[in-house]
Amino acid sequence: MNKPLRNSHPLFKIANNALVDLPAPINISSWWNFGSLLGLCLIIQILTGLFLAMHYTADINLAFYSVNHICRDVNYGWLLRTLHANGASFFFICIYLHVGRGIYYGSYMFTPTWLIGVIILFLVMGTAFMGYVLPWGQMSFWGATVITNLLSAIPYLGMDLVQWLWGGFAVDNATLTRFFTFHFILPFIVLAMTMIHLLFLHQTGSNNPIGLNSNIDKIPFHPYFTFKDIVGFIVMIFILISLVLISPNLLGDPDNFIPANPLVTPAHIQPEWYFLFAYAILRSIPNKLGGVIALVLSIAILMILPFYNLSKFRGIQFYPINQVMFWSMLVTVILLTWIGARPVEEPYVLIGQILTVVYFLYYLVNPLITKWWDNLLN
């Protein structure tokens, strides 16, 4: 009997097994839409970024004006730029919801998938940071100076490392050129890592909202989840385009409309909104090296979840106290985001320190509470 081409062609077979005939749990909710939304975000970012790179000039005397030229003189350049800048925000909204879903439903028990996911998160954060430097406005320059300077906290190697990264004794033309190079190449590395992420996920199959084995009750990915994903695409693209066409600079920093000036420091240096929670954690530790360690750990701590799971059930659907803790942690992250945008003065410093302790305690206490709850029900 003749097989359909998608089952016989060596190339189509790979795509078919990942996107068409993939057995998917029948009961996965809309929280499982964010993986495909992240894929869409990545494609949007790569395409808009590619066209922006055709008109951008990575030179400290020209970068700011080349971005200005893109917005004023290039056909639909303003649309490309605002889509790219706001697309990054939507990328992070989706990635944080995706991670939150993984924590809530215990998806971190797919250990290799989870660990690669955390590495992808680090890569995306690095890409976004370097992209923020490229327009060479005030916040670009000072953000780059402050964040790259953190490497100087590394004992013995610190200062040499920073100067090696800068390509000189300060953030200068060499820094901008290499940041542009890395900003261009990293999304393709993220794309490759995403393929590996999916490869490992498809070894085990998807998790589902009740955390039980769903092998006895699966349906093909297409048409059921392709259409469900398309609904998600339409909603996200609608919100993104609405933001881009109504208020494209809502999430940006006004200081970045001023060309970079090494002689004038902005009153308040801060990164884009999606890094503010980590920035608040960095600032809440009075010691420089301690702050850098806390900053890295704020994301890296996600890697301990698969190895520190003490519960009998997968996820926290069946653990009421843990659910309260989870939503409290979400509020903590939102408050940290707010603190990151505030000046370094009381009461903000103290609030930031308390929230930082609460943030890290969640990851340490959460498994213990599940264990206690299991013992209670025995």
Curated annotation (Swiss-Prot):
Heme b b562 binds at residues 84, 183. It is found in: Mitochondrion inner membrane. It is a multi-pass membrane protein. It comes from the Eukaryota. Its cofactor is heme b. The keyword Transcription regulation does not apply. CDD domains: cytochrome_b_C (cd00290), Cytochrome_b_N (cd00284). Binds 2 heme b groups non-covalently. Changing residue 370 to M: In strain: NC37. GO terms for cellular component: mitochondrial inner membrane; respiratory chain complex III. Its main location: mitochondrion. Pfam families: Cytochrom_B_C (PF00032), Cytochrome_B (PF00033). Component of the ubiquinol-cytochrome c reductase complex (complex III or cytochrome b-c1 complex) that is part of the mitochondrial respiratory chain. The b-c1 complex mediates electron transfer from ubiquinol to cytochrome c. Contributes to the generation of a proton gradient across the mitochondrial membrane that is then used for ATP synthesis. This is Cytochrome b. It comes from Drosophila simulans.
